[in-house]
Amino acid sequence: MLILTRKVGESVLIGDDISITVLSVRGNQVKLGVEAPKEVSVHREEIYQRIKQTKDEPYLASS
């Protein structure tokens, strides 16, 4: 795991197409801005887990 320290307004680049910028810090909450191509899905972890769980659940057959 790469660990970085950033200040408000500073960014981290992932590859050539993805930029994550620190927008604000208030207490223990950090607001991030993510710029990525439309074909790259960007989700909060808890939302991604729900999406993954929904895809993994078998569909119930109606009788």
Curated annotation (Swiss-Prot):
**One BP term from GO:** negative regulation of translational initiation
Covalent S-S links between cysteines: none
Recorded hits in InterPro entries, A to Z, give: CsrA, CsrA_sf
Pfam family, any one: CsrA
Q: Which SUPFAM superfamilies match?
A: CsrA-like (SSF117130)
GO MF term list? mRNA 5'-UTR binding
Keywords in alphabetical order? Activator, Cytoplasm, Repressor, RNA-binding, Translation regulation
GO cellular component terms listed in the entry, alphabetical order: cytosol
The source's superkingdom equals Bacteria
Per UniProt, subcellular location reads as: Cytoplasm
Cited function: A key translational regulator that binds mRNA to regulate translation initiation and/or mRNA stability. Mediates global changes in gene expression, shifting from rapid growth to stress survival by linking envelope stress, the stringent response and the catabolite repression systems. Usually binds in the 5'-UTR; binding at or near the Shine-Dalgarno sequence prevents ribosome-binding, repressing translation, binding elsewhere in the 5'-UTR can activate translation and/or stabilize the mRNA. Its function is antagonized by small RNA(s).
Task: Spell out the subunit comment.
Answer: Homodimer; the beta-strands of each monomer intercalate to form a hydrophobic core, while the alpha-helices form wings that extend away from the core.
What does the similarity note say?
Belongs to the CsrA/RsmA family.
HAMAP family to which the protein is assigned, alphabetical: CsrA
Q: What is this protein called?
A: Translational regulator CsrA
